[in-house]
From Swiss-Prot:
HAMAP family, A to Z: MnmG_GidA
Keywords: Cytoplasm, FAD, Flavoprotein, NAD, tRNA processing
Classification via NCBIfam families: mnmG_gidA
Protein's name in the database: tRNA uridine 5-carboxymethylaminomethyl modification enzyme MnmG
GO molecular function (one): flavin adenine dinucleotide binding
Binding site for NAD(+): 273-287
Length: 629
């Protein structure tokens, strides 16, 4: 076994895979440490990728040169465009994944990646010196692996415990081994740890439930994909269905009668769970006025015999779980393959991180994924990609890649984590992004592909394809502006017959697209440049035209905010000497140590008056430094 690496990644989940691939593809000798070879990028909870905000993150990962989008497209059982009836700022793609094929896909990519070794051992601790500089890791066979940077991506395995009712025992997800030694290393390095909780529902045998009365939830009949490079699509007739059912009054009564047996409500659980993915008993308590709740029945893999009971996670003991399941419509004769459970695990306070995802007080140590207090495969993968990129760039002596809030949901997430911290598992939501009209599902490439190219993760071939992609959009918009349609044109007749528009006079194609009721597909046969475009290109054209004024105002606002990002704060500043700065602001600024005024202004507890005092101090104390660059 080699003992010297540039980058070591500990944990082969969604964050670890992206971190390791990014590092290796940037020509760094990389080791990925994972307990099991066949447990790479597994889906221990929901068998899906994407969703509101999350789906846009997957497209951002792809634009930067990551792998998740390709894997999701290649292993999709169903593809669905969410929120299509609402504004474009919240449109998102979601795929139902074949979890076995997804893991197999990523495993093959890892094994075939140049510069990357997969080591199936446990990491038992970190190697570091008296200056808090991490230099490697310990393995469970006492081997020391040396590295210039270490990335911890342990997910929910860090000192984890499974909870069912009053039963509690050490275990990772699905009764796999837990990881304990790393927590002690982090504590010894002075890193503050927290304890979070999540959970997963039961998996039930398909042939034991009757879904004949359930509501069918099909995919979307459009050519949709996460990855820019995907060119083949699963037709709607070959996509696997999902189903919707509702819990019953009997389900509610069972929970009320047995609430004290739940790990959540018996006092067994001391940690904090996810607000946006609560256990079913938590829903029953928090929303007592509701008699029923939605439950989605989803396939996990074509090779399996189970349904995933989405929305029905619980920490109840097995005998109560069985009663709960049998109270659901069509589940009267249900047989269970895997019971639901809750899991507690260690994570760090992410306010200890710099924007690069390196620990501020520990050199060469990066963290990504659920160890940073987030939830979700997509959030983890986005962080892993950034950590892998920045660990590699640090080795090369390059500045880190820091995405702004107006550039990517990944930027929103990392900015939230390091400036606001977390008190519960963090989930990305469209509402967290103040510039969501700019951070759309359709424009991830135009926002981030340039970064991917400059970083070195986008090939020349893909870059050239992207340039053609952009040129095609520009050409189509140009043609829409030039071509005109009279009230007697065939297009005008078609639009009137379909109640989409009544063209009372001559209109350009551009003006017609501005009409909210017009479907751009009606123009395709009349405008040659539209005929070869992908779905995302057509969506971009419609949004850029129809929301032109809003997008322009949003970009003008962003230009003003970016100026604050350019006002740098010296690393040696002493905040205690800043006059008239509120005590809370001093404490927060000292703890987080923002890199610029823009970041400082987003810290909870730092108000506009504090920012004015800080700017005044900087101009007075650092007159020779150009804080505007």
């Amino acid at each position: 076994m080699k003992s010297n690496y540039d980058v070591i990644v500990v944990g082969g989940g969604h964050a670890g895979v992206e971190a390791a691939l990014a590092s290796a593809r940037l020509n760094k000798k990389t080791a990925l440490i994972n307990l099991y070879e066949d447990k790479i990028a597994t889906m221990p909870c929901n068998p899906s990728v994407g969703g509101p905000a999350k789906g846009i993150v997957v497209r951002e990962i792809d634009a930067l040169g990551g792998e998740m989008a390709k894997a999701a497209d290649a292993t999709a059982l169903q593809t669905k465009l969410l929120n299509s009836s609402r504004g474009p700022g919240v449109w998102a793609l979601r795929v139902q994944s074949d979890k076995e094929e997804y893991s197999k896909y990523m495993r093959n990519v890892i094994k075939n990646q140049k510069n990357l070794d997969l080591i199936t051992r446990a990491c038992t601790g970190l190697v570091y010196d008296e200056n808090k500089t991490v230099t490697g890791i310990y393995l469970d066979d006492q081997t020391i692996l040396n590295a210039k940077a270490v990335i911890i991506t342990t997910g929910t395995y860090l000192k984890s415990e499974i909870l069912k009712g009053v039963d509690r025992y050490e275990s990772g997800p699905n009764n796999e081994k837990t990881t304990k030694g790393i927590s002690q290393s982090l504590i010894d390095l002075g890193i503050k740890l927290m304890r979070f909780k999540t959970g997963t529902p039961a998996r039930v045998y398909r042939d034991s439930v009757d879904l004949s009365n359930a509501v069918l939830e099909p995919g979307t009949d459009m050519k949709l994909a996460f990855s820019f490079s995907t060119s083949t699509y699963t037709p709607i007739e070959k996509q696997q269905p999902c189903y919707l059912i509702h819990s019953t009054l009997e389900t509610k009564k069972i929970i009320e009668d047995n609430l004290e047996k739940s790990a959540m409500y018996s006092g067994t659980v001391k940690s904090i769970g996810p607000r946006y993915c609560p256990s079913f008993e938590d829903k029953a308590v928090r929303f007592r006025e509701k008699d029923t709740h939605q439950i989605f029945i989803e396939p996990e893999t074509l090779n399996g015999d189970t349904w995933y009971v989405q929305g029905f996670s619980t920490s109840m003991p097995i005998e109560v779980q069985e009663m709960m399941l049998k109270s659901l419509p069509g589940f009267e004769n249900v047989r269970v393959k895997h019971w639901a459970y809750a899991i507690e695990y260690d994570c760090i306070d992410p306010m200890q991180l710099s924007p690069s995802l390196e620990l501020k007080d520990v050199k060469n140590l990066f963290t990504a994924g659920q160890i940073n207090g987030t939830s979700g495969y997509e959030e983890a993968a986005g962080q892993g990609l950034i950590a892998g990129i920045n660990a590699s760039r640090k080795i090369d002596g390059l500045d880190p890649i820091i995405l702004r809030r107006d550039e990517a949901y990944i930027g929103v997430m990392i900015d939230d984590l390091i400036n606001k911290g977390v008190w519960e598992p963090y989930r990305l939501l469209t509402s967290r992004a103040e510039h969501r009209l700019l951070l759309r599902n359709d424009n991830a490439e135009t926002r981030l592909k340039q970064y991917g190219k400059e970083i070195g993760l986008i090939s020349d071939q893909e870059w050239n394809q992207y340039l053609i992609y952009v040129k095609e959009i520009e050409q189509a918009i140009k043609e829409l502006k030039e071509i005109r349609f009279t009230p007697k044109s065939q297009l005008a007749i078609n639009l009137k017959n379909k109640n989409q528009a009544d063209l009372s006079h001559g209109y350009s194609g551009y003006e017609i697209i501005k009409i909210p009721t017009v479907d751009i597909n009606e123009l395709i046969e009349f405008i040659p440049s539209l005929q070869k475009l992908k779905t995302n290109q057509l969506q971009s054209i419609v949004i850029e035209i129809r929301f032109e004024g809003y997008v322009k105002k949003e970009r003008q606002l962003v230009d003003k905010l970016v100026k604050l990002e350019r006002k740098k704060i010296p690393l040696d500043i002493n905040y205690s000497k800043v006059d008239n700065l509120a005590t809370e602001a001093k404490d927060k600024l000292e703890k987080i140590r923002p890199l610029n005024i823009g970041q400082a202004s987003r810290i909870t507890g730092v108000n506009p008056a504090d920012i004015q005092m800080l700017l005044f101090y900087l101009k007075k104390q650092y007159p020779l430094e150009n804080i505007d660059n």
